[in-house]
Amino acid sequence: MKKKLLSLLLALCFVMALVPMTAFAEGTSVDNWDGTADTSWYTDHKTDTEYHFTTAEQLAGLAQLVNDKTASVSFEGKTIYLDNDLDLSGTQWTPIGNGGNFGRYFAGTFNGQHHKIMNLNHHYTGDELVRNGLFGVVSDGGTLKNLLVIDADIDSNDGSLIAGILADWVNGGTVENCYTSGKIENNVGSKFVGGLIGQCTWSTQVKGCGSDATVISTESDEDHVDTVGGLIGQWENGQLVDYRLLVWRFCFLQ
């Protein structure tokens, strides 16, 4: 009984904790995406260690830089700040970091400063292995924090294996004070699907996060099994990882 009361109390605390985070973003300006990508904030300032985003085009530019097949930029040691809300309506989003290996991943720090990224739309039917959420691959100490991804609509009907609204795959990274809502749906088997993150591996830490996203898996083939979670689809490498390195605390789902 005591454990049950404690769990309910913790859930209430963290739900309430998100109220000021959401309220903080209310009333701020919103930039609407025109479908293009702007990389000038980086190409003209490559030695900078901090960048401030005010447009959705800059965010799309980040995806373009990280996903470049010949000259991918991981942003390790650099911090990106989101200075206002972004609306991604009307154009399909290309995740930041993609591919089936660690060749193209985000390793910097993305600080949303409690702002919202709204109406992320991604209906993918290609053959990339990781390509669904706001971030495709976060690795090597990459950090996502203080960010809300609101009213996302993700429909994964391919063989991409991993799908999450905030991030598909986090390998040895940190996700802190992040929240997602909307819908993520998978209609193909053998996937890891989560309302927040599709898959966490190695020394990943998830702290103070929540989601009330709808997570749907409709695969009916008994030979294909999905691993589905309200927050995280799968946490892998149980036999290889020292679980003292794994942190998952102060999280909730609705």
Q: Where in the sequence are the language-model features?
A:
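Positively charged n-region of N-terminal signal peptides that target proteins for export
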Residues: 1-5, 9-10
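C-terminal segment of classical bacterial N-terminal signal peptides
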Residues: 15-24
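Surface-exposed repetitive/solenoidal architectures
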Residues: 24-254
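Broad structural signal for hydrophobic residues in well-ordered alpha-helices, predominantly aliphatic
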Residues: 14-15, 234
